[in-house]
Amino acid sequence: MSRLPVLLLLQLLVRPGLQAPMTQTTSLKTSWVNCSNMIDEIITHLKQPPLPLLDFNNLNGEDQDILMENNLRRPNLEAFNRAVKSLQNASAIESILKNLLPCLPLATAAPTRHPIRIKDGDWNEFRRKLTFYLKTLENAQAQQTTLSLAIF
């Protein structure tokens, strides 16, 4: 007996077009929950000892602007993905950061400045900037979800 008919049947069953349709609000809620969980997990890792005596919210205005700029969300994530490789014991954060890309909206225009700079191997700077970036993403996602749900 040939396996081809069975494979074709399986392909038809898992094809997105034949599955129950997902409403836009359902997909927004689901994706937001996944993104929110990833953000929370990264923040949990960032809060683990050894904690420095620095204030994590103390970023200069330029860094804050760069981390909040919508068109730099993806380039900033790429910068964090590069920087995490130079840190010790950050493999858990690295694996979550790789999965965070689908949570980011596409840029509406080309960035007008360079993405965030993070010193290689500087755990404190990485932690401070990534925490601010994730809080910014979380706030933006919450606003977008609220607006989208209000429309429906």
Curated annotation (Swiss-Prot):
**Key words of the record:** Cytokine, Disulfide bond, Glycoprotein, Growth factor, Secreted, Signal
Could you tell me in which tissues this protein is expressed? Answer: Activated T-cells, mast cells, natural killer cells.
Q: Where is this protein localized, as stated in its record?
A: Secreted
For this entry, list what GO says about its biological process.
Answer: immune response; interleukin-3-mediated signaling pathway; positive regulation of cell population proliferation
User: What pairs make up the disulfide bonds?
Assistant: C35-C103
Which residues are tagged as glycosylated in the record?
Answer: N34, N89
Q: GO molecular-function annotation terms?
A: cytokine activity; growth factor activity; interleukin-3 receptor binding
Q: Which GO terms describe its cellular component?
A: extracellular space
Q: Which domain of life is it from?
A: Eukaryota
Task: Point out the signal peptide segment.
Answer: 1-19
Q: How does it assemble?
A: Monomer.
| Family stated for the protein in its record | Belongs to the IL-3 family.
Tell me the function of this protein. Answer: Granulocyte/macrophage colony-stimulating factors are cytokines that act in hematopoiesis by controlling the production, differentiation, and function of 2 related white cell populations of the blood, the granulocytes and the monocytes-macrophages. This CSF induces granulocytes, macrophages, mast cells, stem cells, erythroid cells, eosinophils and megakaryocytes.
Recorded protein name is Interleukin-3
Q: Which organism is it from?
A: Pan troglodytes (Chimpanzee)
The beginning of the lineage is:
Eukaryota, Metazoa, Chordata, Craniata, Vertebrata
- Record gene name: IL3
